[in-house]
Amino acid sequence: MSTRLHRRVALITLGCSRNEVDSEELAARLGADGWELVSDAADADAVLVNTCGFVDAAKKDSIDALLAADGLRAGGGPSGPADGAGPGPRAVVAVGCLAERYGTELAESLPEADAVLGFDAYPNIATHLAAVLAGTPVPAHSPRDRRTMLPITPVDRAAPALPPAAVSTGAVPLRRRLTAGPVAVLKISSGCDRRCAFCAIPSFRGSHVSRSPDDVLAEAEWLAGQGARELVLVSENSTSYGKDLGDLRALEKLLPQLAAVSGIVRVRTVYLQPAEMRPSLLEVLLTTPGLAPYLDLSFQHASPPVLRRMRRFGGSGHFLDLLARARALAPELGARSNVIVGFPGETPEDVDILAEFLEAAELDAVGVFGYSDEEGTEAAGLTDKIPDELIERRRVRVTDLVEQLTAARADARIGSRVQVLVEEVAGGLATGCAAHQQAEVDGGCVVRLSPGGAADDGPERLGVGDLVGVGDLVEARVVATEGVDLIAEFIAVLDRARPTAAVARPTPDRAAALVGRGVADGT
């Protein structure tokens, strides 16, 4: 049944970059069914809030976003004016991890949301939204522990009833970019097979399922055609990519192919599991031209007893050895990690071990989190809980240390040359990220351009007649720092951004055929 009426929808995305990809897939599904995407929720008929359910703060942000969207209504609700003439949205719908994780419980406790939909609803999202606007009750998602659901891996799935996407076929992914800019996120897999004691993600994201290399490469080409210059490869655990494809070295084979995609100047892989960092993978990551010499390693702690209680492996010595081997391959390495303080049973000596590790590790960026119970996890049932006030003191201590160490790490780059992907040009300055910096996560780099520039909105004309514009890869020399941010002086343009190629949007028939190809539809 067609839902092709003129409807306007606003998408609000919270949480991680994986959620951003899910929102872009939802936008493509809705656009293929005739929905108009608007940026202002007050102008929409329906507001779709892609929620995060990872930690308490993220859950609160998601609920606040749903309440804020509800507050934009003019009192009509789903039964308001059918033509959308009234101000404010007529429907507020929750999707994403919070909706998947809590489903009916969220719907009962938050009546401001007209529907709460799980991942399995994504392929038919347009139909569900149309039903909500028509006043038809849409059952709330009933959560299931996806750890108990064994996926049909790509190796065993039946082939789709259309030719598989491949490089240079012109296949258009079911995705619509929602933000302009030269950096694009590319999801290579979904779910996780690890069972860390503190993490609830596998319970609602499910087991690890890799996308096929052809699908990933086809989407990479499409993103390049949309103006992307850097690809950030995301998943719940990127080091597991390919194990369900029957090839433990699938990522090592895929990475050089992605780096060779025309128009792409940098590929960055994030969410790496230290316990799965094989020497051969480390070498590919850090020596392949076009791959950022960058490691995003989730250490979580450095004390072996704490790590064992977390159901994780390694320790300070193992992690320092891994970093030493990485720097032997790439002396300019950028390395970031996250750590948790206050895990049940953590002692003052454990915190000292973590601090000593951080002092020796020379990381460029570190996220520090205080432990909190997540229902349904093993850690929530552990004894020897640390009082909240002590967790906060430990978090402040480690955060203060990290700020000093990462600033010193940035200072150590003064005098070095960096390659910066330009994201903005204004006022004689080009801003972007060097190879050791993940956009919006690790700080950035401000490049001073030569005098004699053009208008503030760029591109900036240099004294030598060059142009620096968004998407250009430039070389610069670091001359100063501000915290973890670098200040550099322009040297040369290394690779210019090409004009963005026109890429067709999916037609409704094509979009329908592609339903299920993406990872965001419940796998």
Curated annotation (Swiss-Prot):
EC number of this enzyme: 2.8.4.4
Which UniProt keywords are present, listed alphabetically?
4Fe-4S, Cytoplasm, Iron, Iron-sulfur, Metal-binding, S-adenosyl-L-methionine, Transferase
A GO BP entry: tRNA modification
Q: Which residues form the MTTase N-terminal domain?
A: 7-134
Where is this chain's protein located in or outside the cell?
Cytoplasm
Any single Gene Ontology cellular-component annotation: cytosol
Looking at the record, the residues that make up the Radical SAM core domain are 178-409
Look at the named UniProt entry and state the broad enzyme category this protein falls under: transferase
- One term of GO molecular function: 4 iron, 4 sulfur cluster binding
- The answer to whether UniProt assigns keyword Transferase to this entry is yes
Protein's UniProt keywords contain 4Fe-4S? yes
Residues annotated as binding [4Fe-4S] cluster 1: 16, 52, 97
Per the entry, what this protein does is:
Catalyzes the methylthiolation of an aspartic acid residue of ribosomal protein uS12.
Give the family this protein belongs to, as stated in its UniProt record: Belongs to the methylthiotransferase family. RimO subfamily.
Supply the name of the protein.
Ribosomal protein uS12 methylthiotransferase RimO
Species for this entry: Frankia casuarinae (strain DSM 45818 / CECT 9043 / HFP020203 / CcI3)
Q: Name the gene.
A: rimO
